[in-house]
């Protein structure tokens, strides 16, 4: 998905290299036509979000890419890969913005699940940056964080309300990694499997 999003950024003025990348994506899709998302029956209706960011990944404007995904039970139900609207000055800021995007989706899904009489609180949001996690717990502005736009601090508000609970996860187990950058083949296949994208026929 990340490669599709990168190619989409150049729709207005594509180059030969973009066509080569799109052909490679189409070749991958043709080779994995028998793959799909696996939704096993009988899983508990628990929700968990994963957020990650590729700090300054865009070579043109140095904006970071946010990647998020959400599992209901053990099944992938929501994902997104998007370039951030502003330039982050640190990895912490980029990860904090990505976690905010993840939190917004968690809140929407929480409301949808309440329509089915499923009530969830303290929904875990997994992040692999301890500084970003600490920023959600500390309301005091420091010189290194005071420039962060107010709209990104709604994450802290919802953590304090108990809607979601941001937790540390080791980078090796960070499922959202696949939505932020190109990965080595073995790592890509590992995350694809962990997300429940399997050969189904």
Predicted features along the sequence, with ranges:
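Structured nucleic-acid-interacting core domains from mobile-element enzymes and related host factors
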Residues: 27-51, 118
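Active-site-proximal structural scaffolding
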Residues: 18, 28-30, 63, 102-105, ...
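RNase H-like nuclease fold core
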Residues: 50-92
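Generic beta-strand/beta-sheet core signal
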Residues: 3, 40, 50-51, 71-73, ...
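Short helix-interrupting loop/turn segments at helix-coil junctions
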Residues: 1-2, 32-37, 57, 118, ...
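RNase H-like nuclease module associated with reverse transcription
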Residues: 46, 76, 82-201
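Secondary-structure capping and boundary motifs in well-ordered enzyme cores
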Residues: 14-18, 42-43, 62-63, 90-95
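C-terminal reverse transcriptase regions that engage the nucleic-acid substrate
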Residues: 1-36, 170, 178-180
């Amino acid at each position: 998905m990340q490669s599709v999003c990168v190619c989409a950024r150049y729709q207005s003025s594509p180059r030969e290299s973009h066509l080569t990348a799109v052909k490679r994506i189409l070749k991958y899709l043709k080779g994995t036509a028998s793959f799909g998302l696996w939704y096993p029956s009988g899983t508990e209706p628990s929700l968990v979000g994963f957020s990650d960011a590729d700090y300054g990944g865009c070579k043109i404007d140095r904006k970071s890419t946010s990647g998020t995904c959400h599992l209901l039970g053990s099944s992938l139900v929501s994902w997104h890969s998007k370039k951030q609207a502003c330039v982050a000055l640190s990895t912490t800021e980029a990860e904090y913005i990505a976690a905010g995007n993840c939190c917004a989706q968690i809140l929407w899904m929480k409301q949808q699940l309440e329509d089915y009489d499923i009530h969830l609180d303290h929904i875990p949001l997994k992040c692999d940056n301890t500084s970003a996690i600490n920023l959600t717990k500390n309301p005091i502005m420091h010189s290194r964080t005071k420039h962060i736009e107010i709209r990104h601090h709604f994450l802290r508000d919802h953590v304090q309300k108990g809607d979601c609970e941001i937790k540390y996860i080791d980078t090796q187990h960070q499922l959202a990694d696949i939505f932020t950058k190109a990965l080595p083949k073995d790592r890509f296949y590992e995350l694809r499997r962990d997300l429940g994208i399997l050969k189904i026929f």
